[in-house]
Amino acid sequence: MKNDKLVNILAPLCLHLESASPTVHIVKATPDMYDKVGLLEEEQQIHKAVKKRQREFRAGRQSAREAIKRLVSNDSELAQVPILSGKAREPLFPSLISGSISHTDSLCLAACALKSEVPSLGIDVENNTSLASHLFSSIYTQSEKALMETSNTLPDALIFSIKESLFKCLYPFVQVYFDFLDAQITLQPDAENAGQFHFELIGENRTLLQANLPNLSFHGHYCFTEQYVFSLCFFSS
């Protein structure tokens, strides 16, 4: 899949907003990025990892660096800051950048924005395949399960993807793991295969999580094709 085709597919997600504010850049890893050796500190983090993990890690960092270059073309040094992994295996971007990385077996995406405009963001891509029925109760709330049961078009992986991107977006603020069932998702379709989403924190962790969230505008977007499910969310200043 070429980058220009990818951008067209992801247009409903607003992932390439060069003329808008806030600007979010997304980059799809090219085949060479999977085997391109990264910065020394990055390589030290993965030298004991299996080959598959090393390739995914490198592709994510290389695509993230390309997104940073497009975002701040006048600061080439910023793109040479190592993107290491935090305690939750989250990528640690340069202090001026908010970013997120996601991958399947065949696709790797990185999204970046200026932290002054977008304090936090999360991106996720999943294969558009069926979920095992025994997983539904650990991912879907009753409301979400009812929505999926009455829809003939929504992919099984959509709510899963949305909650993955939501975790990435919220984690920098809450700094704790939270469960799939701690958030309830509502969809606002803009088209048959794309739209916006909103979330509500529920469950026994609600008060703790809510207390650490910023008082900022939240934006959630999703779309899907026959092959992939995409989601993106971010807070904007």
Regions found by a protein language model. Give the residues of each.
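Core catalytic alpha/beta fold that binds nucleotide/phospho-ligands
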Residues: M1-S237
